[in-house]
């Protein structure tokens, strides 16, 4: 397993000179996610609720698409925006939506106990989009299950990797959020590398247990 500095430095090196596509993809995801938190006060509650639900579903699929798009970038397919939309909406929309909805539902149910179990479960499921990409024959439940197995003993490692970006996140916030458009692809690429390392340790077969 690569060290945290190695994961971050290698991810940054892969993105150097190729930021445009990942940054535009991050902007699209951010704008759609932000839209789900808004809503005009002049519109009816029903219209706002329906619009929110539609945009929430779109945002969930886009987040999946972004994760898979960065995985494909790592493997040489660098048209991230096109790959994001293709993975999110064109290739297997129902399966993707099922994966994201079930993951969100399970995390929510764990959060009903306490916030910490919900966070732990979120990290347990964090590899599910990559597993779904690499194993198109698997259903959403199996992707989530295999992610749990793959992340067993590694959830804290990924949490600390994410935590190591806190300084860059604060800098991004100070730039009115603009800098976060570069931090998001960098973090995602580091997570992709983390996944590839875990998969290699598991013998490129995540995971049959």
Whereabouts are the PLM-identified features?
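Hydrophobic alpha-helical membrane segments
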Residues: 1-209
């Amino acid at each position: 397993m690569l060290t945290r500095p190695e994961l971050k430095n290698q991810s940054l090196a892969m993105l150097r000179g190729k930021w445009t596509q990942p940054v535009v993809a991050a902007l699209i995801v951010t704008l759609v996610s932000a839209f789900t938190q808004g809503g005009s006060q002049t519109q009816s509650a029903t219209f706002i609720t329906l619009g929110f639900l539609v945009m929430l579903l779109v945002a969930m699929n886009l987040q999946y698409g972004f994760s898979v798009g960065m995985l494909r970038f790592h493997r040489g397919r660098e048209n991230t925006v096109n790959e994001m939309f293709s993975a999110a909406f064109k290739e297997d929309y129902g399966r993707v939506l099922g994966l994201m909805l079930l993951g969100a539902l399970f995390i929510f149910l764990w959060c009903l106990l306490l916030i910490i179990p919900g966070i732990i479960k979120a990290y347990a499921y964090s590899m599910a989009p990559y597993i779904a990409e690499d194993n198109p024959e698997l259903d959403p439940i199996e992707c989530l299950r295999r992610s749990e197995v793959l992340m067993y003993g590694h959830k804290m490692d990924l949490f600390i990797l994410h935590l190591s970006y806190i300084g860059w996140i604060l800098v991004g916030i100070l730039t009115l959020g603009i800098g976060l458009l570069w931090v998001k692809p960098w973090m995602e690429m580091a997570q992709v590398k983390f996944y590839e390392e875990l998969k290699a340790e598991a013998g490129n077969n995540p995971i049959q247990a």
